[in-house]
Amino acid sequence: MSKRYAVVLAAGQGTRMKSKLYKVLHPVCGKPMVEHVVDQISTLNVDKVVTIVGHGAEKVQEHLAGKSEFVKQEEQLGTAHAVLQAKAELAGKDGVTLVVCGDTPLIEASTMEALLKYHHEKRAKATILTTVIEDPTGYGRIIRDDLGIVEKIVEHKDATEKEQRISEINTGTYCFDNKALFEALENVSNDNVQGEYYLPDVIKILKDSDEVVAAYRMESFEESLGVNDRIALAEASRLMQRRINENHMRNGVTLVNPENTYIDIDVKIGQDTVIEPGVMLRGETVIGDDCVVTSGSEIVNSVIGERVHVRTSSIFESKVGDDVQIGPYAHLRPESDIHDHVKIGNYVETKKAVVGEGTKLPHFIYMGDAEIGKNVNVGCGSIAVNYDGKNKAKTIIGDNVFVGCNSNLIAPVKVGDRAFIAAGSTITKDVPDDALGIARAKQDNKLGYAKHLNHGK
């Protein structure tokens, strides 16, 4: 097999996005557009990937670190000029080079592999990836002769009325003989209205030299969708989301209403899990088998075990074991570690908290910077008071502890195994094993006093 290279064009500023974020870094289903492209290329046994960066170079390099080499295009003088920036990296090498735009997040490895194969079969010096669309307005047209051989690419604004009726378009993705590409790039002119160096001109140069130029037509236009504004970004996200969701459903996940379920590309979901509408699964979240996630839930960069039921709750950067009940309206903040058979009820919030097996936090509870043992019951309204206005401190609760309602555990504090905390207590000292901790004022009833109070009656 000949050497394979790839050049990814990612230098454009993307002014039509009207954004401070550089165009190719806008996310599509949890990943920057350009990273989608590079990740697909990386599956093709490519010997070297060179990403052409310009605006936002440092940020692009940060996202693609370890996946690509980089060359900076100091001035954006057109697509041919951009590819030419890789001259020091690639010129003179035997092999083939893919050229792909960094703003086409839907391009798939299988399509690029088919393009490479077709290029080899045709013994071409250049092969254009094309497709057919109903409304080709604005796209370069593929002009073929009577035998179907590619003659040239004509930009829409330069096309005759007859040529404008052609529906086969240039997608902006190419495969070139590497040596021929860089030799031709040296001869591209900027003698045009925009004063830029255009990559399609390489096709004309090769044709004028009687080299073989081919065109591989793909079935799906959506893979070639370039994102230049927020409308196209939304469309790319919609199409990518459909692709992601259909893949999960084929693998045994039930999406009750896939059109209203938002799952990032790196999320993993086990078989027979049910995801209701309005759920957002973000980042590198992993969900096990036989789970249920109900409407309005958001899970971000978290690991969820098997047979977990999440009811309208938020989970961020946390770990949840098997057979856990969460919600409704629970909030697991980062570094929560919920063990097996735990109940996290409504309006419960945890943060940097370990909750032991079989423990119940039924409702209206805050446990921050806390370590809670096994088979603990924490009553309604109880709080691990972890912040004194300056520093955070830790609360430790042993196994088989009962914490009565409306208890305040003032950290740092430790409650021993099998201890009881009386309802309404404010605990400021450690409670030993098997002890009853009670810290509240003695009730004093003032007999007859109520009649002296003005109740407005």
Curated annotation (Swiss-Prot):
GO function terms (MF aspect): glucosamine-1-phosphate N-acetyltransferase activity; magnesium ion binding; UDP-N-acetylglucosamine diphosphorylase activity
Source organism, top-level taxon: Bacteria
Co-factor binding details: Binds 1 Mg(2+) ion per subunit.
Span list, region Linker: 231-251
Annotated residues for binding of UDP-N-acetyl-alpha-D-glucosamine: 9-12, 23, 73, 78-79, 140, 155, 170, 228, 333, 351, 366, 377
Covalent S-S links between cysteines: none
Region listing for Pyrophosphorylase, in residue ranges: 1-230
Start and end residues of each stretch annotated as N-acetyltransferase: 252-457
Pathway assigned in UniProt: Nucleotide-sugar biosynthesis; UDP-N-acetyl-alpha-D-glucosamine biosynthesis; N-acetyl-alpha-D-glucosamine 1-phosphate from alpha-D-glucosamine 6-phosphate (route II): step 2/2; Nucleotide-sugar biosynthesis; UDP-N-acetyl-alpha-D-glucosamine biosynthesis; UDP-N-acetyl-alpha-D-glucosamine from N-acetyl-alpha-D-glucosamine 1-phosphate: step 1/1; Bacterial outer membrane biogenesis; LPS lipid A biosynthesis
Keywords: Acyltransferase, Cell shape, Cell wall biogenesis/degradation, Cytoplasm, Magnesium, Metal-binding, Multifunctional enzyme, Nucleotidyltransferase, Peptidoglycan synthesis, Repeat, Transferase
InterPro entries in alphabetical order: Bifunctional_GlmU (IPR005882), GlmU-like (IPR050065), GlmU_C_LbH (IPR038009), Hexapep (IPR001451), Hexapep_transf_CS (IPR018357), NTP_transferase_dom (IPR005835), Nucleotide-diphossugar_trans (IPR029044), Trimer_LpxA-like_sf (IPR011004)
GO cellular component term, pick one: membrane
Localization (cell): Cytoplasm
Annotated Mg(2+) binding sites: 103, 228
Cofactor(s) annotated in UniProt: Mg(2+)
Residues making up the signal peptide according to the UniProt record: none
Binding positions for acetyl-CoA per the UniProt entry: 386-387, 423, 440
Residues annotated as the enzyme's active site: 363 (proton acceptor)
CDD domains to which the protein is assigned, alphabetical: GT2_GlmU_N_bac, LbH_GlmU_C
Substrates-to-products reaction catalysed: alpha-D-glucosamine 1-phosphate + acetyl-CoA = N-acetyl-alpha-D-glucosamine 1-phosphate + CoA + H(+); N-acetyl-alpha-D-glucosamine 1-phosphate + UTP + H(+) = UDP-N-acetyl-alpha-D-glucosamine + diphosphate
Listed HAMAP family: GlmU (MF_01631)
Subunit structure: Homotrimer.
Family, similarity comment: In the N-terminal section; belongs to the N-acetylglucosamine-1-phosphate uridyltransferase family. In the C-terminal section; belongs to the transferase hexapeptide repeat family.
Function: Catalyzes the last two sequential reactions in the de novo biosynthetic pathway for UDP-N-acetylglucosamine (UDP-GlcNAc). The C-terminal domain catalyzes the transfer of acetyl group from acetyl coenzyme A to glucosamine-1-phosphate (GlcN-1-P) to produce N-acetylglucosamine-1-phosphate (GlcNAc-1-P), which is converted into UDP-GlcNAc by the transfer of uridine 5-monophosphate (from uridine 5-triphosphate), a reaction catalyzed by the N-terminal domain.
Protein name: Bifunctional protein GlmU
